[in-house]
Amino acid sequence: MRKLLLMAVAVCCSAPTFAQTDVQPVVGGYEGDLYVNVGSADYVEDNDLRMYAKVFVNASEDATGKVDFSLPNFSFMGIKLGDIFLPTIGLNAQNGVYTFGENPEVRLTFNTQEIGTILADAKLDDAQTYVKGDSIVAYIPVKWVQSETQKMPIAVLFKGVRVNPYALSNYNFNDAMRWEQSRPWDSKNGYFDWTTLKDNDEYWGQSKWQMEEYITPDAWCVSHVMGMNGLGATVVGAPYSTNGDEDNPDYAVRLTNTPNPFMPTQVVPGYMTLGTSFASASVLDLNKADGGTFGGVAFTGKPDAIQFDYSRSHTQAGDTLYAAEVINSEEPATVVAYLWKGQYKQEAVPGETAYTDPSTVTMYGRERNILDIKTTTGGAATKSDDAACIAKVVKSITGNVEGKLETIVVPLDYGKYAGTDVQPDSLNIIFAASDYFGQRSKVGAGNALVVDNVKLLYYHAIKDASYNGNEFVFGEDKTADFSTEAYVPANLQFTKVGQGATVEQTYNAETGVLTITVKGQDVRFNPESVTVYTIQFDAVKTAVAGVKADAAAEVAPAVYGIDGRRLAAPVKGANIIGGKKVIK
């Protein structure tokens, strides 16, 4: 019996053991192409089936070493269903490739307005799904449960890359799949549900626009307004082809200040934001009209500037398309950007068009509150103890740029937070065809701003370099020559350029070369976001200086007692140190 037990123990001890897989390398968001093949179990990459989507892999709260997989806002055949959430899936790692473990089907319930409740079973195909580097390929077999004995297959395939947290999600507006139905907001209805308006003949009978014209680039909000049951609804933005190629268009966003179709002297400003636009007006007192932006996107980067391409045009005096009193050929366009943290709140902000008093809401993250700009509507404004506007810019764009796009770089001002470790948690950017914070009565009808290729820049450089108090400039090849001088670290001074940049210095004692590597905050996703400087010092002099310094440190004055004996260290009382009497 004892022999059998020993053999069993030996077998158990010899069985392979596996370390728990670290899930952090795959945790995060991924964006890319989603292919949905309804009625078939075959995964196909047909461009007619392609749509933009995001998926998320998160560490499971219920089990260490496992992940939750989610595909938000899943839809097919034009029907918006909801989220596919597949929890607690094991992860395996081998040679840099992460695969997913076996996972059971999850029963999902989707409530739709089109066809009522839909039941579906879904899982992650563990035999084919994987993450490698920053790429993910996910196979998701879905079954539409029409009855327990009849289930329609839906093959869902996602191919994407990790979301760059330091960049804007949709910056060039080229993908036609990423132009979507806009969802205007007001204080009475919240975000508009287009399904309730689709067949509303009264609404579209009073509106001068069609539903398909209310579109916006994904991740941005164009400031279309809905009016009152269609009355006064106004479209102020649209895709704009910059290359004239219908087969392969290069899209930008065109924002236009547009008169209300029923009140041509009331011009709706055209702007877009990463947050949510809102407008408010009382038909009986149009002087109380107001609007703007609230909210933004979650963001923890510290960009140094915003770069974008633009063109600008003005309606000129004498143009008969618009009333003379709403033409403003000198109006500037505006770009506004700000990074902040904490909560900003304002009570009783009106946010709809009504005959008398518009309804109000408590508004969070209103741009004027964050930027400390006076508001003309709304109640008391407060903020949390940790709230701070960390960086900002309000830039006017003057003149005309027509027939082409020009590139402009707009620096962000970090003010007192420059060079600090204070981190933002939110970002908003606003592009406006008008003087955004100017008088509403001065908004110029027909004035337009075209915006494309919006990028966040992260600097990675050094400036104001000096050695031994003497300023110097690096050459075009980022080198400097101090080959006649010894390298003493304390003698080199410079200033880092880049709010989120990091600096590394390494010195080669054999060659006398000091290498300074400056990495931009986005270097993880942008390998070009790095600058390397080298300084040549005299290796021999540096070595000699080091030896002398070491020797000087080793030679200390001898210590003797008053009786003439040499001591290892001074004692209490009288000592003879370096030939002088010292009392301790």
Feature locations, PLM:
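C-terminal outer-membrane/trafficking sorting elements
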Residues: 15, 541-584
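Edge beta-strand at a domain terminus
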Residues: 20-29, 36, 51, 83-95, ...
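Short, solvent-exposed loop/hinge segments that bridge or flank secondary-structure elements
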Residues: 27-64, 111-119, 187-202, 206-207
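Predominantly extracellular/secreted and cell-surface proteins with exposed
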Residues: 49-126
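Beta-sheet ligand-binding and adhesion/scaffold domains
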Residues: 99-165, 275-278
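Aromatic (Trp/Tyr/Phe) and Gly/Pro-enriched flexible surface segments
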Residues: 162-307, 328-458
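Beta-rich interaction/scaffold domains
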Residues: 459-543
